[in-house]
Amino acid sequence: MVAREGGPAPADAAQRIAELREQIRRHDYCYYVLDAPEISDAEYDRLMRELLDLEQSHPELVTADSPSQRVGGQPLAAFRAVSHRVPLLSLANAVDDQDLREFDRRARERADRPLTYVVEPKIDGLTVVLSYEEGRFIRAATRGDGLIGEDITENIKTVRAVPLRLKRDIKSLEVRGEAYLPKAAFARLNEEREEAGEAAFANPRNAAAGSLRQLDPKVTASRPLRAYFYNILHLEGADGVGEQVEALQMLEDLGLPVNPERRYCRTIDDVIDYCRYWTEHRHDLPYEIDGMVVKVNELDQYPLLGETAKSPRYAIAFKFPPEQAITRVRDITVKVGRTGVITPTAELEPVRLAGTTVSRATLHNEDIIRERDIHIGDYVVIQKAGDIIPEVLSVLKEKRTGEERPFFMPQTCPECHSPVSRLKGEAAIRCTSLACPAQAKEGLIHFASRDAMNIEGLGPAVVNLLWEAGLVRDPADLYDLTAEQVAPLERMGKKSAANLIAAIENSKSRGLAALIFALGIRLVGQTAAKTLARHFGSMDQLMKATTEELQAVSEIGPKMAESLQRWFAVPANRQMIDRLAEKGLQMETEKAGDAGVPQTFAGKTVVLTGTLTTLDRREAQRLLEERGAKVASSVSKKTSLVIAGEAAGSKLEKAKELNIPILSEADFLQLIDRV
C-alpha cells in the first residue's frame, strides 16, 4: 500500500489511532470518573489533536466509539421517542427516622431472609438510561414518564464521564443513572450566560436537563456534565449479580462512574446514621443532592417485596429537611385556577434558598393566612417543601413595626367580578361563574397539557394570544382554528401556526382516557380517567351513568361521583362534548361497544419482557390494562402470564422456572384481534 502524502501508511495509522484511543479513554476515566488526572490539559489536548488529524486523513478508520465522536454532531430536528425495556419507577419518600424504620419493617415482613441495605447520595440531576451492545454504547434516553423517554444519544456522547466502550464486551447491558452539573461548573455557566445577556438557570438540575435536551449536541458538549450510575436494568452475556453492592462494583469494573460515597449498611440503624451524616455534610459535596437513596441489597428479594403503581417497595428516598430563609412579604396577590379556586400568593423580596432565588411563595388558602397571621409587610420564614415549592412557614412578629397590613380574600372574582363562594368542608374560595375567563384560559392550558391532549406548542402564552384575539373560548374551539387565523398573531408566523394546527389535529387520536382527564373535571385525575374509560367504554355511557353506577366503579368515591354528575349536568359542557365528537375526537375506547372492551385479562397480573416489534411497550401496556390486566414489572409467583418479545432475558427464564404461561407477541396480538 502507498502511504498518503505527508502521513503514515493506513496500517501504521490504524495502529496509532488504536493507541491514541486507548490512551484518551484511560485519561478520560482518570479525570472524569476517578477525579485523579495523570497528565496536564495541554498533553491531553495534544493527544486529541493527533487523533483528530489522523482520523481526518483516514476517515475509513473512524468508529462510533472513538473519543473524537464526543465533540457533537449535526443539530437534530427533534428528539425521537424511546420505549423503556423496564418501567422506570420513582421512589417513595421518607422524611424522618420513623419513616425509614417503617420501610425496614415492611420490607422484612415481605422478605423470606434477612435484609441489608446500600445507601448513596440522591443526586439532583436528570435520570438517563444507557444501552450497550457487545460492549459498545448504542443509545441513551431520558426517563420521560417512566415508560417512554426521549432519545438523547448524540448528547450523551459528549459527556466524557460516560464510556463509549466498556472495559468488557458484554453482549447487552442497560443501566440507569443520573447526569448532573457540578456546582462550580453551574456557577461558571450562569456567569457566561449573564455576560451573554441570556437568562441564568435556576438550579443545577435545570441546567443539566436543559443541556441534555439541546437539539444541537455541540451546545451539550460545551457544558461539563458528569454522571453516576446505580442500577442494572438489563444484563445479557455475563454472570448475573445477587446483590446491589455487586451490581455497583460490576458497573465500576466496566468503566462506568459509580458514586464513591455509597455505603453498605447491615442494619436500619446504620442507614439512619449515614443519612444523618449527609444531612449535616451535604454542602461539602461538589454537586447538589436532595436526599439519600436506600435500597435493599439482596436483589433476589425484589420480586417478593414488589412494587406499588408508582414506586418499588425495595427502595426509598430519604429527603433532607427543607432549608429555610428569612425575607419580607411585599404584597399578596391572587390567581384564579381552572376549577375556579382563588389561590393567594406571597410576593417576596428576592432571597436565595436551597440554591435558587425565590421571589414568590404559595399561601395555599385563606385559612393558612389566618392561622399563621400573615400580613403584607411581615418578615417571614420560608422553606421549600421537598426543596421544590416555596411556602411561608411562620411570621417573625417581633420584627413588626405597625405598618404591616392584614390581607383579605376578595369577595368577588378578580377576573370576572362574579361572587365567590366557599363550599362546606373546604378551605378553597371559588369563583361561581361558569363563564369566568380566567377559569376558561386555565382550562385550555390544562386541556393542551402533556398528560392530557398533549398539544405541543399550546402553552399559557399561546392560549392567551388566542383568547385575546377572540379565537377560542373552550376546548372545542381549538379544532376550528386554521393556520391563516393563527399566523398573524404576535410571535407566531406561518411555520409556527402550521405546527400548532398539526399538533391540534394529532391530538384527536389521544384516546378516551386522555380526553376525560383533559376536560378538567374536579377530582378526576389521570388514574381515575383511565378507570372510567376502561369501565364505561365510551363518553356517552359515562355521561349517562347515575351516581350509584359511578360509585360502583373501583377508585370512584362519592365526592368524585358527585363532581362528575355536576359537570355533565351543565348544558354548555354537554354541548362542548358534542362539538368535540363532531370534530373527530375519540369518544370510545378502541374496539369498545356499549359493553366496553372485552375483559380478556381480568384479574390477571401480566409481565412484558423483551423487545416488541409490532407495538411499543406503552401501547402494549395500554391494551392489557384496557382488557382488565394489572401490568407488573417483575416476575413472581403472583404473575399470571408473561408476554415475551425478542431478546427476552432473565424474566423469561424465571417464568419458565415458575411454570408461568408464556405468550409470544404474535400470540398476544391474535388473542386481542390485532393481527
Swiss-Prot record:
| Top-level taxon of the source organism | Bacteria
What GO biological process terms are annotated to this protein in UniProt? DNA repair; DNA replication
Which GO molecular function annotations are given, in alphabetical order?
A: DNA binding; DNA ligase (NAD+) activity; metal ion binding
Q: Which residues of this UniProt protein bind Zn(2+)?
A: C413, C416, C431, C436
Segments traversing the membrane: none
Catalytic activity reported:
NAD(+) + (deoxyribonucleotide)n-3'-hydroxyl + 5'-phospho-(deoxyribonucleotide)m = (deoxyribonucleotide)n+m + AMP + beta-nicotinamide D-nucleotide
Q: Which InterPro entries match?
A: BRCT_dom (IPR001357), BRCT_dom_sf (IPR036420), DisA/LigA_HHH (IPR041663), DNA_ligase (IPR001679), DNA_ligase_CS (IPR033136), DNAligase_adenylation (IPR013839), DNAligase_N (IPR013840), Hlx-hairpin-Hlx_DNA-bd_motif (IPR003583)
**Does Zinc show up as a keyword for this record?**
yes
Cofactor(s) recorded for this entry are: Mg(2+); Mn(2+)
Which sites are catalytic? K122
Annotated Gene3D superfamilies: 5' to 3' exonuclease, C-terminal subdomain, 6.20.10.30, BRCT domain, DNA ligase/mRNA capping enzyme, Helix hairpin bin, Nucleic acid-binding proteins
UniProt KW DNA-binding keyword: no
Keywords, alphabetical? DNA damage, DNA repair, DNA replication, Ligase, Magnesium, Manganese, Metal-binding, NAD, Zinc
In short, the EC number is 6.5.1.2
Annotated BRCT domain residues: 596-675
Q: What class of enzyme is it?
A: ligase
GO cellular component term of the entry, any: cytosol
Q: Locate the residues binding NAD(+).
A: D41, A42, E43, Y44, D45, S90, L91, E120, R143, E178, K295, K319
| Function per UniProt | DNA ligase that catalyzes the formation of phosphodiester linkages between 5'-phosphoryl and 3'-hydroxyl groups in double-stranded DNA using NAD as a coenzyme and as the energy source for the reaction. It is essential for DNA replication and repair of damaged DNA.
Under HAMAP family, the record lists: DNA_ligase_A
Record's family?
A: Belongs to the NAD-dependent DNA ligase family. LigA subfamily.
User: PANTHER family per the record?
Assistant: CHROMOSOME TRANSMISSION FIDELITY FACTOR 18, DNA LIGASE
Protein name, per record: DNA ligase
> Which species is the source of this protein?
Heliobacterium modesticaldum (strain ATCC 51547 / Ice1)
